[in-house]
Amino acid sequence: CIMPITSQEINLPIGWSIFSTYIETENMNVIAFLSGIQSHIILVKNFLGEAYLPEWNFNGIGNIEYHQGYQVKTNQECTINLQGEYFKPYENPIYLESGWNIISYLRTSPSPADLVFQDLILQGNIVIAKDELGAAFLPEWNYNGIGNLQAGKGYQLKTNVSDILNYLSND
């Protein structure tokens, strides 16, 4: 499910954002994963609310998971530089809980939200998707305020029931 060594740069703005990765690094523990920007991190949370608080030396997250996105608050703009093996998007399904999720975007190229979520839309199983700024994708209203999903970003997604999101390849 993974390919040879590759790299990814994830740019984080000051304040709150949501990030994800398509790279499996040698050490996926959140402390090692974010070691290059440690001094700029205030808080990292997963969709369950489990947190990493560097100032308190508290790691309730453990390892970064390829299928999840993470909310992060930084005290300045910074960049996560990663090297590792690439998760092929079409071979790594995203398992969704009923209700709210924070998902990763595993493709290297941007793709319109309506195409990414097409199967969920056809099943009537997507309520809303939001980016880090709160821009929404509302299929019931045929509204796409997100535009394209972007590599390195994470997205909040609300479903009616548990499901699986399958990404297309980058081709």
Residue ranges with predicted function:
Residues C1-D171:
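N-terminal exported-region signature
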